[in-house]
Structure formats: C-alpha cells, structure tokens
C-alpha cells in the first residue's frame, strides 16, 4: 500500500493525528526488562500493542537501536507492527543525507532491509541526494524543513533570494520533488508560525511535527496552524512523554493512557 494511502486511512479510521516515536533507552526501562537481550524489542512491542489503535503512525529512531547493536530488534519490531497492526505506517527516523550512490544504499536499508513505509531525509545536499528515496514511489520521503531544535534557526532562517531557507525547502519539495505524491516535511511544534507558513506553501502535504510533550510544543497552536481543511495533514509526534509515562510492569498501560490523553487533546482542535 502507498504510504500516503495508508496514512490517510489511519487518520480517518483511527481518528488520530498522533505519531508515537519509538526512542528506546534501556536505562529507563522497567526493572523486569533490565538486562534482557531482547529488552528493546519487548519494550517497544509492548508500547506498540498498547497504543496502535490510537495512532496514525509509529516512528522508530534508528540511532537508539544501532547504538546498542539492536538493528535486528528494529527489523523484528517493524515486522511485528506490519503483522499485528496492518495499516499503521512506520516512519524510519534516520535523517539520512549523502551523495547519490550512498543514498541508494540507505534507501535499500530503509525500504528493503527494515521494510519501513517512510523515512526522514536531510535535503541539505540537494535533489540528487534525495532521488534514490524518491525512486520508491510507494514509500514516504519526509524531508527536514523547520526543525524543532533551537539551533535550527542557524541555517533554516538564512535569507536565500528573498525567502528563508526553510521556505525554499518547502517550496522545492512541493513544486519540484513531489511528482509521485510521496513527500512530506518535518516542521517542529515549537514554531507554530512556521507550521502555518509551510502549510500555506505546500497545500495538503503531510507534515511530521515533533516537539510536543517533552520539548514543550503547544498542541492547540500546532493543530490550528497545520491542519488541512479536512482536519488532517499532520503526524504530531510524541516520544518520551508516552514511552516513559510509567516506570513499573504496567508501563504499557501508562503509555496507553498518555497516548489517549494526547490524541484527545489533539482532536479537540481539529
């Protein structure tokens, strides 16, 4: 299934704009999982199973797996999501950016090895560094645009021919790079004015919006700035506030409660 088709169906069928980020930190796992060789998979799978009916997507961050030699557990996790929660797209948060020949290998890694439905990509090196991902027309390619971190303004607010760099990225992606209709953009919840600007430049293109929860982004401002006329168009990510809502053996139930609260808070402004 095309990533965008799956995403739109998830928005409607699950009545949700919530994306749960899977950033597993074993130091924060409950005691009963500590020291287990499969702890990362078990923790993430429990979160997934507890929240899948409340989300429009899951977003595993590859560094949290690779740093602990747990890429095999990431493969197993994505297989688990596809097998047990079909229709919930998986975004591999990798933020790759390299020359074409290397990007080809990163695309194979994301879409053929891990079988992700979408990947986050850094557009800084230009179109030829993104083409290998775009060559998979049924997969989502979500490009960094206006990121949620404070230092994003160092480059993203630079003037380039009368517009800010993040605006140029948004316009390029919407007008030139999205021939297969499989592109999206990353725009941080910490900057609602920029969310509104990107929405104006890109029409109904999906926006992946990190920065609520632990990073302090405002849900009401985010939704009002970025929603489409139909009340969709957003994947609003929350990671730590959901993953670590509980510390005991009932951590998955606590994560579900946090996800439900977040989803409903988002829906209040759709």
UniProtKB/Swiss-Prot annotation:
Protein's name according to its UniProt entry: Orotidine 5'-phosphate decarboxylase
Keywords per UniProt: Decarboxylase, Lyase, Pyrimidine biosynthesis
Source species taxonomy: Bacteria, Pseudomonadati, Pseudomonadota, Betaproteobacteria, Rhodocyclales
Pathway: Pyrimidine metabolism; UMP biosynthesis via de novo pathway; UMP from orotate: step 2/2
GO molecular function terms listed in the Swiss-Prot or TrEMBL record: orotidine-5'-phosphate decarboxylase activity
Provenance organism: Azoarcus sp. (strain BH72)
Keyword Hydrolase: no
Entry EC no(s): 4.1.1.23
Record-linked SUPFAM superfamilies: Ribulose-phoshate binding barrel
Catalytic reactions on record: orotidine 5'-phosphate + H(+) = UMP + CO2
Record-linked SMART domains: OMPdecase
Keyword flag 4Fe-4S: no
Family affiliation: Belongs to the OMP decarboxylase family. Type 2 subfamily.
Single GO biological process annotation from the record: 'de novo' pyrimidine nucleobase biosynthetic process
Active site (record annotation): 95
């Amino acid at each position: 299934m095309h990533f965008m088709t799956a995403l739109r169906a998830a928005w409607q069928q699950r009545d949700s704009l919530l994306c749960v980020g899977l950033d597993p930190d074993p130091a924060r796992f409950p005691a009963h999982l500590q020291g287990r060789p499969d702890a990362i998979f078990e923790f993430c799978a429990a979160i997934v199973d507890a929240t899948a009916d409340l989300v429009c997507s899951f977003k595993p961050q590859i560094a949290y797996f690779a740093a602990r030699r747990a890429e095999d557990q990431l493969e197993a996790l994505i297989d688990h999501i596809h097998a047990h929660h079909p229709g919930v797209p998986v975004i591999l948060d990798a933020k790759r950016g390299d020359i074409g020949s290397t990007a080809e290998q990163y695309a194979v890694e994301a879409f053929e090895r891990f079988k992700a439905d979408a990947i986050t990509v850094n557009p800084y090196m230009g179109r030829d560094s993104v083409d290998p991902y775009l060559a998979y027309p049924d997969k989502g390619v979500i490009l960094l645009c206006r990121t949620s971190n404070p230092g994003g303004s160092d480059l993203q607010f630079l003037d380039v021919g009368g517009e800010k760099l993040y605006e140029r990225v948004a316009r390029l992606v919407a007008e030139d790079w999205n021939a297969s209709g499989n592109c999206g953009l990353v725009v941080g919840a910490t900057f609602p004015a920029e969310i509104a600007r990107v929405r104006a430049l890109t029409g109904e293109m999906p926006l992946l919006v990190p920065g609520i929860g632990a990073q302090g982004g405002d849900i009401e401002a985010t939704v009002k700035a970025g929603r489409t006329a139909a009340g969709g168009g957003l994947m609003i990510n929350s990671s730590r506030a959901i993953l670590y809502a509980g510390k005991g053996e009932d951590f998955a139930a606590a994560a579900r409660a946090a996800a439900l609260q977040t989803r409903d808070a988002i829906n209040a402004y759709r």
